[in-house]
């Protein structure tokens, strides 16, 4: 399934970007490096059941078991001790990354309520894009009956692009539905 996006990238997107930005070498063309998906547990960090359900959901969505992130320092105001689980994250590369991006663009994003496109200003200045998802139900792999609570996640798409303009062009060619301002 994901081979299609990768093949499309090399056959169609690379020549377009070389034309658009006048690259002299094919290795200058921006490409996807990795996708990281992160979910902070918030007040659910005291609840072991919430941690387990988050691990299962992220694993179902990505096809890869997430890593549990732990608190570096104790914070009394949040009732967090050092070493307590505070979130889960997963890093996708190569095959799984392309599969996830394809599912995100074609299946998940169109299922968001009142969706008009994603914010084109969420680039970090170096061609990487981050977006927040408010609920996990937009992914077709998640069954409505099996979730205990609606939780969101952060998705970061890391590219080799040097500027936001290059990163935006790459993602737009891949089919990312940016909102027109």
From Swiss-Prot:
GO molecular function: rRNA binding; structural constituent of ribosome; tRNA binding
GO terms of biological process kind: translation
Annotated GO CC locations: ribonucleoprotein complex; ribosome
InterPro entries listed in its UniProt record: Ribosomal_uL5 (IPR002132), Ribosomal_uL5_bac-type (IPR020930), Ribosomal_uL5_C (IPR031309), Ribosomal_uL5_CS (IPR020929), Ribosomal_uL5_dom_sf (IPR022803), Ribosomal_uL5_N (IPR031310)
NCBIfam families, per the entry: PRK00010.1
Subunit record text: Part of the 50S ribosomal subunit; part of the 5S rRNA/L5/L18/L25 subcomplex. Contacts the 5S rRNA and the P site tRNA. Forms a bridge to the 30S subunit in the 70S ribosome.
Entries under HAMAP family matching the protein: Ribosomal_uL5_B
Protein name: Large ribosomal subunit protein uL5
Lineage: Bacteria, Bacillati, Cyanobacteriota, Cyanophyceae, Oscillatoriophycideae
């Amino acid at each position: 399934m994901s081979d299609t996006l990768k093949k499309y990238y090399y056959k169609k997107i690379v020549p377009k970007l070389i034309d658009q930005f006048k690259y002299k070498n094919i290795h200058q063309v921006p490409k996807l490096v990795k996708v990281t998906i992160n979910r902070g547990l918030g007040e659910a960090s005291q609840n072991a059941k919430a941690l387990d359900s988050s691990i299962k959901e992220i694993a179902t969505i990505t096809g890869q078991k997430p890593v549990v992130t732990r608190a570096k320092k104790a914070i009394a105001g949040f009732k967090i001790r050092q070493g307590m689980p505070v979130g889960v994250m997963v890093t996708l590369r190569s095959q799984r990354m392309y599969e996830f991006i394809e599912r995100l663009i074609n299946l998940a994003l169109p299922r968001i309520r009142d969706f008009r496109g994603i914010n084109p200003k969420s680039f970090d200045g170096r061609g990487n894009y981050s977006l927040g998802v408010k609920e996990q139900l937009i992914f077709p792999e998640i069954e409505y009956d099996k979730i205990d609570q609606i939780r969101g996640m952060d998705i970061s798409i890391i590219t080799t692009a040097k500027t936001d303009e290059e990163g935006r062009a790459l993602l737009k060619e891949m089919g990312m539905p940016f909102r027109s301002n």
